[in-house]
Swiss-Prot record:
One of its GO terms (biological process) is mitochondrial electron transport, ubiquinol to cytochrome c. One of its GO terms (cellular component) is mitochondrial inner membrane. This is Cytochrome b-c1 complex subunit 6, mitochondrial. InterPro entries: Cyt_b-c1_6, Ubol_cytC_Rdtase_hinge_dom, Ubol_cytC_Rdtase_hinge_dom_sf. Residues 1-10 have a biased composition (Basic and acidic residues). It is found in: Mitochondrion inner membrane. The keyword Nuclease does not apply. It comes from the Eukaryota. It comes from Macaca fascicularis (Crab-eating macaque). Its main location: mitochondrion. Component of the ubiquinol-cytochrome c oxidoreductase, a multisubunit transmembrane complex that is part of the mitochondrial electron transport chain which drives oxidative phosphorylation.
Length: 91
């Protein structure tokens, strides 16, 4: 057994498929729950209002209107759902 073989044994198992299994990618439960909550009817409606406001504001060259209220409504609806579901997914 040569020096190169010993290094290979110390640094890797030699089987790429086995290494991939060992390195499972962790998924943030917050991201998953947020995506699920964004599909609910209340969040979909709030997002639609936000997108309409964004189009309206973007189409004007001069306006004092912003979409702060619509953004906060959407985030409130989504985060209300997330707060209810998130802790059920934690281990």
């Amino acid at each position: 057994m040569g020096l190169e073989d010993e290094r290979k044994m110390l640094t890797e198992s030699g089987d790429p498929e086995k290494e991939e299994e060992e390195e499972e990618e962790l998924v943030d439960p917050l991201t998953t729950v947020r995506e699920q909550c964004e599909q609910l009817e209340k969040c979909v409606k709030a997002r639609e209002r936000l997108e309409l406001c964004d189009k309206r504001v973007s189409s004007r060259s001069r306006t004092e209107e912003d979409c702060t209220e619509e953004l906060l409504d959407f985030l409130h609806a989504r985060d209300h759902c997330v707060a209810y579901k998130l802790f059920n997914n934690l281990k």
